């Protein structure tokens, strides 16, 4: 399984850091301090201007994940959510020439986007259930907007359907090439794969169930300040998928947590303050949780340069097998 370019090792992050410095200069910030704060599907930097004290966030895109038109489409949805749905999202800071997506020259060139710095912190871990109720409510507002929004001409984002996640496209690599994939693991996860494919096909892609989603709407991508409305960040994975996938993504890496049933109930409670969720869809929640879990087995194998992937490693595959056995035998996995 081939790692994506930001996990390829060598001096790639040194070169990406230089790209970030160049992007800051092109934004009129020649003396800015540029600090790497996260690497995943892109590299995220904090940009501090020592002259004014202003702070912003710069995203340097990985290669081959999004064409420039898809990045522009993401930014269009952020703006629409903020202006039409009342969802707090970061504003884009255009370059002096008006460009919202800045292609920085280099070998190879990379697309970059500068965002305003939003105040707030991730909801505290000791109040996970409370955080999930807020998350459910803001997710519902985003889904309600997505169902009626008229996408602008040229709008393009990828899909998170079965083929894109686990099938012929396998955007993050194939789970069969994941870490710790012993014969026993292959056997149980292959059974899981087949069950997921069949159930998702039966669930269908009707307009009420499938549309534009954030696709990584974890608590880590919420910023809260006191009891006010949260801000939603990191839309880089947004695309077309099942709305319930946003709940599954919220449970990423913690699917085994003993409070997961309470987290799900809290998310549903928050969601239903905004819009309905039919019982027949609620019945498939664990199908989507396991769909996301199997996708993350593949993700860990291709993102070895990301801290959480290195930390979880083959143990995540083993835990996935345990959850899969419970799911396949009709027992709630948590």
Regions found by a protein language model. Give the residues of each.
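ATP-binding pocket architecture of kinase catalytic cores
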Residues: 49-151
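Active-site activation/catalytic loop segments of kinase-like enzymes and analogous catalytic loops
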Residues: 244-276, 291-307
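ATP/Mg2+ or Mg2+-diphosphate-binding catalytic cores
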Residues: 2-7, 174-175, 295-334
């Amino acid at each position: 399984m081939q790692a994506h370019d930001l996990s390829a090792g060598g001096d790639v992050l040194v070169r990406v850091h230089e790209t970030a410095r160049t992007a800051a200069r092109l934004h009129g910030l020649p003396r800015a301090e540029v600090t790497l704060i996260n690497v995943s599907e892109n590299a995220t930097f904090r940009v501090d201007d020592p002259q004014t004290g202003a702070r912003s966030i710069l995203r340097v895109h990985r290669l081959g994940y999004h064409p420039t038109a898809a990045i522009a489409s993401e930014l269009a949805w952020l703006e629409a959510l903020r202006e039409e749905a009342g969802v707090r999202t970061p504003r884009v800071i255009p370059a002096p020439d008006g460009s919202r997506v800045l292609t920085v020259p280099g070998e190879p060139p990379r697309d970059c986007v500068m965002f305003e710095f939003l105040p707030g912190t991730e909801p505290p871990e000791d109040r996970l259930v409370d955080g999930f109720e807020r998350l459910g409510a803001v997710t519902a507002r985003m889904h309600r907007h997505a169902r009626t929004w008229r996408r602008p001409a040229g709008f393009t984002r990828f899909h998170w359907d079965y083929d894109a996640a686990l099938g012929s496209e396998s955007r993050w690599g194939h789970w069969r090439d994941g870490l710790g994939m012993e014969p026993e693991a292959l056997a149980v996860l292959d059974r899981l794969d087949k069950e997921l494919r069949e159930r998702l096909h039966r669930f269908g892609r009707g307009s009420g169930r499938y549309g534009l989603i954030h696709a990584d709407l974890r608590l880590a991508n919420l910023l809260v300040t006191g009891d006010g409305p949260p801000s939603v960040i990191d839309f880089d994975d947004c695309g077309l998928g099942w709305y319930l996938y946003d709940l599954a993504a919220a449970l990423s890496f913690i699917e085994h947590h003993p409070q997961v049933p309470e987290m799900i109930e809290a998310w549903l409670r928050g969601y239903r303050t905004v819009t309905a969720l039919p019982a027949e869809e609620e019945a498939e929640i664990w199908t989507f949780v396991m769909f996301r879990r199997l996708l993350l087995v593949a993700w860990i194998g291709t993102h070895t340069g990301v801290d959480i992937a290195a930390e979880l490693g083959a143990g995540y595959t083993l835990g996935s097998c345990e959850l899969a056995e419970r799911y396949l035998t009709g027992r709630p996995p948590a």
